[in-house]
């Protein structure tokens, strides 16, 4: 398999399933609860992440997140008062982060 084909397959996979979104899958109809469940599960499973990232220390700082996934960490940067920018390989992930913003989760 050449690298172009592999990259295409990886991108297609993440377009179909945004990283982390399966945590809220059972709540698809209630989008606010969907995003809340993703966040709750993320920080229960990766319980050291908040201490590592130190979101609260980002106030007023510029942050670039590469690989937005379901947007859970990106939202933490925004909530902390940082000037946050994000990039992702997939349109699905970027759209999900925009939806979180519109839902004010």
Sequence positions of predicted segments:
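N-terminal, positively charged/glycine-rich alpha-helical extensions of SAM-dependent methyltransferases
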Residues: 1-36
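Alpha-helical packing segments of well-folded alpha/beta enzyme cores
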Residues: 6, 10, 17, 48-51, ...
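Intrinsically disordered, low-complexity regulatory segments enriched
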Residues: 18-19, 39, 60, 82
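Short hydrophobic/aromatic-rich motifs at helix boundaries and adjacent loops
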Residues: 23, 35, 44-46, 67-71
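Conserved alpha-helix/loop element of class I SAM-dependent methyltransferases that forms part
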Residues: 29-61
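Class I SAM-dependent methyltransferase SAM/SAH-binding core
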Residues: 58-102
């Amino acid at each position: 398999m050449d690298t172009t084909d592999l990259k295409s397959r990886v991108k297609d996979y993440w377009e179909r399933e945004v990283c982390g979104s399966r945590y809220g899958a059972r709540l698809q109809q209630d989008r606010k609860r969907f995003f809340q469940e993703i966040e709750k599960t993320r920080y229960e499973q990766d319980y050291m992440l908040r201490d590592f990232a130190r979101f609260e220390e980002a106030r007023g700082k510029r942050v670039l997140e590469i690989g937005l996934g379901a947007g859970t960490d990106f939202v933490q940067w925004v909530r902390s008062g940082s000037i946050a920018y994000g990039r992702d390989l997939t349109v699905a992930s970027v759209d999900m982060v925009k939806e979180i913003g519109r839902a004010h989760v």
